[in-house]
Regions:
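Long, well-structured alpha-helical subdomains associated
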Residues: 128-133
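Histidine-centered divalent metal-coordination motifs
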Residues: 88, 92
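Short alpha-helical functional segments enriched in proximate histidine and acidic residues
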Residues: 20, 93, 123, 127
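Propeptide-to-catalytic entry region of secreted or membrane-anchored zinc metalloproteases
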Residues: 31-42
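Zn2+-dependent metallopeptidase catalytic core
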Residues: 5-30
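N-terminal low-structure segments adjacent to metalloprotease catalytic domains
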Residues: 1-4, 70
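Post-HEXXH active-site segment of zinc metalloproteases
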Residues: 80-84, 95-124
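Active-site scaffold of zinc-dependent metalloenzymes
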Residues: 46-80, 97
């Protein structure tokens, strides 16, 4: 996808995602997270080295204390995966997950049994609702 295509999808889908998920789960405590697509992965973002790589090249991550959802476009091949990443991270924003809650959840659950992840994945199922196609 081109940067223009990505921006068009975000501009269309993100407000709809916010509205639907907010109506079902309420508002988050902070401002609505902005979307940042300027890094190719989490290693490049945190190291400051644009070409840095590692074993966990995810499609997205949210850093709520910074009020930002980071989308790693090289790992997002199409509209479906882009919308799923937006839904997933916006759901986490509304869950009010603190660093302590994250540590406890990571100790008590695997990724697949973590209640925060289960809820985010369940919300992803409605991705077609936010597609322009």
């Amino acid at each position: 996808m081109t940067q223009d295509e990505v921006q068009q999808i975000i501009s269309y889908a993100y407000p709809l995602i916010q509205s639907k998920i907010k109506s079902e789960f309420g508002s988050g405590k902070g401002p609505i997270p902005r979307i940042d697509t300027s890094h190719k992965n989490t290693y490049a973002m945190h190291s400051g080295e644009p070409e840095a790589t590692g074993e966990h090249d995810e499609t997205s991550i949210a850093e709520y204390y910074k009020g930002t959802i980071y989308l790693y476009l090289p790992n997002i091949p199409n509209e479906k995966e882009l919308i799923i990443a937006l839904i997933h991270e916006y759901t986490h924003y509304l869950q009010d997950i603190t660093p302590l809650k994250t540590r406890v959840a990571n100790q008590e659950y695997t990724y697949d049994t973590n209640p925060y992840e289960i809820e985010a994945h369940k919300n992803e199922e409605s991705w077609e609702t936010f597609s322009q196609n």
